[in-house]
Structure formats: C-alpha cells, structure tokens
Amino acid sequence: MKKTIVSTALLLTALSASAVAQTCKYDSIMATAPADRFIIQEKGTILDANTGLEWMACIYGMSYENGTCVGTAQDMDSWSDALMLRDEVNGEEVAGYTDWRLPNVKELASIVEYACFGPAIDLSVFPETPSAPFWTNTPDADEINGGEIPARIIDFTYGTEDFTSTGEKTYVRFVRTP
C-alpha cells in the first residue's frame, strides 16, 4: 500500500511539473514586447509595428488556423538544416510570400517578452510557442575553432541568448522584411 501511495505521488508530481503554464510578471516588470505593437494578419503572419518585420505566427511544422497554431512543431537537428529549410518554405509560398528567412539574433530577440517565462513570448500573439531554443542565422564568431560552427540561439524558456552546437535539436520561426 505504501509503495502505491509513493508511486502515485511521484506520478502526480511529474505530471504537474510537465503541465506548468507560462508565468508573466506584468505587475512588476514592464512589457518588452507588448501585444499592441503586433498586428495579427488573417493569413497567419504577425506584423511588428516597431521593427517593420513580418513573422510567421507559427513555428515550422505547424499551421495557422482560426487564430491559433495547429499540428506538430518540428525541431531541426542542425543549423545547416535550419538554414536550408528556407528554400523549402519559400517553395511552398507560405502566406503567399517567397522571401522567408531565418532571423538574425537581434531580430529574434526583439519578440522576446522578458516579463514572461516558460515561454518568454506573448502567447496571445505567437500561440503554441514552446519553451525551447530557436535557431537564428547568426554564427557565433567567438566560438569558431576550426570544428563545427556554433550558431546563436534564443531560448524562449527565459528569453536568453546563447550559442549551441549545430547538432542540438532546436526550433525555427521564419521572418521576412516586407
């Protein structure tokens, strides 16, 4: 009986930890990427009024339907795969455009909402964004040592910028300059 109770408690703890929701601290931290600066387009894109950039509302592998992202997000095993994915996406003319690209690290950081974590992004603007790293097109020049070239990433768990080995699974969100 005691073994069953302990097993049940451990299972419930694990389930509750995996279902942790996003936390935002707008009462103590000013919004860095407020929802009112973004214009949500019916075609599944988001126009950033501050930067002029147009973002895909959904990450690669998902599609935009009825104001949300559906499907299964696909992570990329390598930076080179993420960079080459651009040609595939542009061939599909997503939202009617053929000029999608991986954002640079500063562009991707511009949509981080530092008042939130788990993920550090406004989910009312960018639905279904996981708390995970996302590729940029920016190499990490400080870490080039003759081997694999690491890329700069933004980890949307807390909105941190870092570098990653090109073999780590990471997500992709495309951007374009209208």
Give the positions of each predicted feature:
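N-terminal signal peptide c-region/cleavage motif recognized by signal peptidases
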Residues: 14-18
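Glycine-aromatic-enriched surface loops/turns that form tight recognition elements
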Residues: 2-5, 19-101, 105-178
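Sec-dependent N-terminal signal peptides
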Residues: 6-11
